[in-house]
Amino acid sequence: MVYDILCEIDGEIVGSCNLLRKKQIKMRHRATVGITVKQKYWSLGIGTAMFREMITLARAWGIEQLELEYIEGNERGIRLYEKMGFRTVAERPRAIRLKDGTYLSEFIMIRDL
């Protein structure tokens, strides 16, 4: 099951947040969350508002744990995720390879509901 929240300002979609519930019966208590906000709309509370709505929806669906992934260096994202109650639980070293050959780690965060 997938659910998307869109933020529209003056006819332009400026942000989106999605919730993807795990399909396997043993994992249906978990869901993955993804979020994006266009840079010129940062610091307006859009990400926080979408996350709050998504958490409300997840609880209504009986989801017990939310998960997300982020790439090292995403400091703005990390601040939002921590503000929303997520905590880092794992690192995937060298998970991302950039065009110049540089590797970045990917991190997993969870939040219990």
Language model: regions and residue ranges:
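Terminal substrate-recognition subdomain of acyl/acetyltransferases
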Residues: Y103-L113
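Conserved GNAT acetyl-CoA-binding A-motif
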Residues: F51, A58-E69
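Acetyl-CoA-dependent GNAT
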Residues: M1-K40, F51-R52, D112-L113
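Short glycine/proline-centered loop/turn elements that form peptide/ligand docking sites
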Residues: G47, F51, N74-G77, R94-K99
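Conserved catalytic-core motifs of GNAT/GCN5-like acyltransferases
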Residues: E67-Y70, E82, R87-T102
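Structural preference for long, well-ordered alpha-helical segments within the folded cores
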Residues: A49, E53, L57, R79-K83
